[in-house]
Amino acid sequence: MSPPLKLTRDTLWSALATLGRRTHRPVSLVLGGSAALLLSEALRRPTDDGDVVTSEPDLGQLQVLIREVAEEEQLPPGWLNGSIQSYTYVLPPDYRDRLVALPPFGPLRVSLLSRRDVILMKVFGLRPRDVADLKAIAPRVEELAFVRGQLSRIGAREPEKASAMQAFLAEWEAG
């Protein structure tokens, strides 16, 4: 049987439970992106992977376990990856105050970026799937205001990206 191309909430939950059973030391993960939305039940569509924002120990030290879980659960080998880590500067310094903890999976502790922080990352990304996810979760006025409040900070580092985000928000709010 070939591995599934997409992860559902149930397959992701099962894989995290398996990872928790297989690890013999404390592990802490913060997930973002669509995986965070799926696990918090804000999004229904499957995702390609779980975006690891931070991990303790470092994600590289967990690769053998992650691959073993992929094989056991018939998941893509990169079902958990740190590709989002290149963009963590987009998150405000206090994002950890808003993390949402999942129930423990044995020694594995998993927290999710808050919905507003995921929305910020999606507006920053603006890939077609990010826009589709935003349409699916229908950000509230206060969530969009939060994103708007981050534009000057992001603009100090990436002015063109902040301008694109501003234009997207204006178009979004215009309907």
Model regions: which residues?
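Compositionally biased terminal segments of proteins
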Residues: 1-175
